[in-house]
Each structure stands twice: as structure tokens, then as C-alpha cells.
């Protein structure tokens, strides 16, 4: 269970929450331009765009959850269990395994238009990485011009325009967008009294214009809530204001330990939240036990290196004592 969002002020921001009951040992990973990407069916790529994101590095290969490349294109994979159906390897097609899709796209595409052209030629297959099972995912891909959602189901590969600029999990994206119709009457303003002129109404609280906005942790509810918060969000253009506001947006769907039990004594939590300034290549993050916003700047690493640059996220809470 995860949530991803885009945000535009002076710069373009892209990020997500990763909600799960355990971590694989994630790291902030910079894949430099000359790091050899060995694709399962497409051979080796020795030169590509640099990228930064959160990944689990297995056998020297970055398995990205989310990433942004040096051109400002962002991409995140989110659970899509029960609906993701990958295709079979076909001779003569550009067969790309689901685990390598993020570096495949971000390594080649400088903008969303190029992404669309690349996806039109691609055959997305379910080849697993080593002993890992093939993760059932769908993806949000975005730049400053807009966002798309990529889903591979029993009906084949689908690319959807994503005007909301958000994504969660099930149900499929068209259903998520359709259910937003249920909230067309919501507003950040106080509601007008239209029930009846015969009954006196009192607005007894602020925020009543958004009554009916779902507050539970299901993926459909999180989609509606983060879309409302993101689309009505107001922020200054500075880096501090923009980054702070982005974390507030995704904070609206934070998962607290104890509220989503997945097995006896096991709870889904927001393991990390990311916010990448895609325009500048700066990856900000917080973790469940460390709310201090930390940053890794892609351009402070050697982007012409052949070696991954990995930083372990800070996991211990930082408390500032004022006296």
C-alpha cells in the first residue's frame, strides 16, 4: 500500500510513501550515467541518463521503488496485486522485465513525450529477479508537463493520462478516477446551505466543505484524499516552502503503526516518504522513526562514474532541544 504524488511550484516535485510491514533495507541510490545496466532481455546499456531514488540493491543491481532522472522525469512503482498481469516474452519485441522498468525508462527518456514513444514499443514481461517473486505493480510517470499511469492487466498494456497527478493501489486507475465523481461537491471553502430554505443551518465548524472526504487507509480512499489535498494545496515558491508543503500533502495519507494490521502483531506503516525536486535532482526523504527531512543531491556525486552511490537513510528520530 503506497501513495505517489506530483507537485508544481517554481520547480517540479515528485515523490511517494512506501507503506509496508517490513523493509528490505532500502537506500538512496544514485545510478550514474556510465553504470552498466544489464537488462534481462535487452542486453547491456553502458551509457544513459543518471538517476536518483530509493532502491534495494541486490547483487549490485538497483531495484528502484521510485526515482527521478537528471532530465526531470520521475517514476514510481506501486502495488497492484491481483490486477497486474505481465506479458510473455516475444521475439522481435523490446521485452522489459517489471523489476528493470524504472531504469529502462529513466535511462532513456528526457520528457514525458519520449516516455510515451518508448512505452508504445515495449513488451512488459514478468521475468523475476533472482529468487525474488515478480512484484505486481503499476506505475506513475511524470515531468513538469504532466503525468501518466502505466498498467499491464489481462487486457494488455495501458497508458492513461493522469490529470490528478496521484496514484495509490487497487482498483485499476480508470476506476480510481471515476470514483472522484463522488466528491465533486467537496470544497476547501465553507459550504452553502442548499438543503432547504425551510431549515436554519449552522456551520458549527471550519472545514465542513470537505465533509465526506474519506479518512480510512484503503487505497481507494487514499487516492481521493491525496488528490483533494494536492489539488487544493497552496504553497510559496521557495525550496523550503515547496518541500515542506509536499511532505504535508503526503502526510495526509500517513500510516501509523497499529492502525492497519496485516497479520497477528504485524502492522503496515509508512516506512519512508520521499520528495524529489525533479528540476534540481535533490532527493528529500523522511522515515517512520526519523521525521527530520534529509536530502541527497544527485549532482554532488560523480554522475560520470561507473559505480553506484548509496546512502543509508537515517532511521533514528532527531529531536531539537531549544533550552
Q: What function would you assign to each model-found segment?
A:
Residues 1-93, 121, 126, 311-313, ...:
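A contiguous strand-loop segment
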Residues 1-13, 118, 129, 134-135, ...:
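C-terminus-biased signal that marks the final domain/tail of proteins
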Residues 20-22, 81-83, 155-158, 165, ...:
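Short, surface-exposed beta-strand-loop junctions and turns on beta-sheet-rich folds
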Residues 68, 148-152, 274:
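Broad, structure-driven detector of short, well-ordered beta-strand segments within folded domains
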Residues 92-127, 239-247:
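Proteins synthesized as precursors that undergo proteolytic processing into mature forms
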Residues 121-158:
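Catalytic cofactor-binding cores of redox enzymes
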Amino acid at each position: 500500500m503506497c501513495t505517489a504524488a506530483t507537485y508544481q511550484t517554481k520547480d517540479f516535485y515528485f515523490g511517494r510513501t512506501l507503506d509496508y510491514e517490513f523493509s528490505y533495507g532500502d537506500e538512496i541510490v544514485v545510478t550514474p550515467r556510465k553504470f552498466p545496466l544489464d537488462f534481462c532481455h535487452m542486453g547491456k546499456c553502458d551509457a544513459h541518463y543518471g538517476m536518483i531514488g530509493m532502491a534495494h540493491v541486490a547483487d549490485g543491481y538497483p531495484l528502484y521503488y521510485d526515482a527521478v532522472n537528471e532530465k526531470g522525469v520521475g517514476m514510481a512503482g506501486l502495488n497492484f496485486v491481483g490486477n497486474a498481469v505481465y506479458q510473455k516474452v516475444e521475439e522481435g519485441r523490446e521485452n522489459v522485465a517489471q523489476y528493470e522498468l524504472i531504469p529502462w525508462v529513466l535511462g532513456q527518456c528526457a520528457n514525458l513525450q519520449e516516455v510515451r514513444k518508448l512505452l508504445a514499443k515495449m513488451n512488459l514481461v514478468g521475468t523475476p529477479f533472482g529468487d525474488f517473486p515478480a512484484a505486481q505493480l503499476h506505475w506513475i510517470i511524470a515531468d513538469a508537463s504532466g503525468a501518466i499511469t502505466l498498467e499491464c492487466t489481462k487486457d494488455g498494456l495501458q497508458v492513461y493520462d493522469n490529470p490528478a497527478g496521484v496514484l495509490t493501489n487497487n482498483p485499476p486507475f480508470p476506476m480510481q478516477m471515476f470514483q472522484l465523481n463522488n466528491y465533486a461537491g467537496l470544497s476547501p471553502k465553507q459550504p452553502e446551505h442548499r438543503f432547504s430554505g425551510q431549515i436554519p443551518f449552522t456551520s458549527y465548524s471550519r472545514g465542513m466543505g470537505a465533509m465526506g472526504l474519506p479518512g480510512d487507509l484503503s487505497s481507494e480512499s487514499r487516492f481521493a484524499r491525496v488528490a483533494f489535498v494536492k489539488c487544493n494545496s497552496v504553497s510559496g515558491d521557495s525550496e523550503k516552502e515547496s518541500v515542506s508543503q509536499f511532505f504535508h500533502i503526503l502526510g495526509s495519507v500517513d500510516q501509523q503503526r497499529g492502525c492497519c494490521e496485516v497479520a497477528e502483531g504485524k502492522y503496515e506503516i509508512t516506512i519512508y516518504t520521499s520528495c524529489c525536486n525533479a528540476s534540481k535532482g535533490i532527493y528529500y526523504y523522511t522515515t517512520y522513526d526519523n521525521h527530520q527531512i534529509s536530502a541527497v543531491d544527485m549532482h554532488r556525486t560523480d554522475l560520470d562514474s561507473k559505480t553506484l552511490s548509496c546512502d543509508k537513510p537515517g532511521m533514528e528520530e532527531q529531536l531539537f532541544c531549544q533550552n
